[in-house]
């Protein structure tokens, strides 16, 4: 009877240990993903490679849009303090009119009237309605081979409910 009781306790402890270990691993991956996302939104004028915008009333692109330092700080602050909701492909806007793409930490090359960009972080912001913005994040890793090649690390889509962010994008597109 004592042996049976000890065996049951060891089995119980083993199961509890496996569950706790699994939760620790799961929590670590979630915390790591959260920290990566929050770091993506921290930027300043110094690490912006280029800002691309698509005007909302016409299908024209501006590949060298400029924001003032205080506007960049305000945008970064809005993004850092926003709550992210995971988005699906069905949440994606049907067109990109009125969107803004911010390319961070990289370089840009212009040749023969074409523009090529190499960047570590890309944030595309497209208003969905007056209170929500579809956010497409792209994180790349440089190949360090003196080319413009990058290795894709992550692409994620989110929705941010923020009328301030919608207003900011509308003012700048």
PLM segments and residue spans:
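Short, Lys/Arg-rich N-terminal segment immediately upstream of the first membrane anchor
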Residues: 1-9
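Function-determining sites in protein domains
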Residues: 8-16, 21-173
């Amino acid at each position: 009877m004592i042996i049976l009781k000890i065996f049951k306790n060891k089995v119980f402890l083993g199961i509890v240990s496996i569950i706790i270990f699994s939760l620790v691993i799961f929590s670590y991956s979630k915390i790591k993903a959260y920290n990566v996302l929050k770091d993506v939104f921290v930027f300043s004028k110094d690490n912006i490679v280029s800002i691309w915008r698509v005007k909302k009333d016409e299908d024209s692109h501006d590949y060298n849009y400029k924001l003032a330092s205080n506007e960049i700080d305000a945008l970064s602050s809005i993004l850092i303090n926003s709550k992210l909701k995971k988005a699906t492909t069905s949440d994606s806007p049907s067109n990109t009119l009125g969107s803004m793409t911010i390319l961070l930490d990289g370089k840009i090359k212009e040749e023969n009237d074409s523009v090529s960009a190499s960047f570590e972080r890309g944030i595309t912001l497209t208003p969905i309605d007056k209170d929500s913005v579809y956010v497409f994040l792209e994180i790349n890793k440089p190949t360090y081979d003196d080319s413009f090649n990058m290795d894709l690390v992550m692409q994620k889509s989110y929705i941010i409910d923020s009328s301030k962010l919608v207003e900011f994008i509308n003012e700048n597109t």
